[in-house]
């Protein structure tokens, strides 16, 4: 079992249950928040980070739907060079009371989640952190194997495009030779 994460969120937007907005809301990360999010996700820089989200009460749960957009620099998985990248990702989350995700008393129990339960975020008290949930959605939207514009050149220069290379370990050996 892992210890709970006690770090302060890089981008917190607390939404009170008794004050849900009637219309879609736009959340934009400040320069400091973008810098901190970039550090969290191992990105050289985030230039723009925003989400437009609509919230709707469903009993004790709060459904959220919208779109997350971000423009950032990312290291190429092949060359390591930074390149400009972006995401435009739909966001659909349900904020549910934490007691609906009750602890099993320390016993690890394997459960199967339905499609509707996959994006549930538990909250405690009378508020939830929409900003942190959006930041987590961004982290999942980043392609960890993104290839920059120079990836093919680097692969060619290191002999990684040759058919006789013999798989992943041969690719590592080719990189070691250089």
What are the language-model segments listed below?
Residues 1-69, 73:
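A positional/architectural concept
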Residues 27, 51-53, 66-68, 87-95, ...:
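A structural signal for short, well-ordered beta-strand segments
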Residues 28, 32, 71-74, 86, ...:
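Charged, alpha-helix-enriched surfaces in structured cytosolic catalytic cores
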Residues 39-43, 77-84, 140, 177:
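Short, intrinsically disordered, mixed-charge
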Residues 69-106:
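Helix-adjacent hinge/juxtasegments
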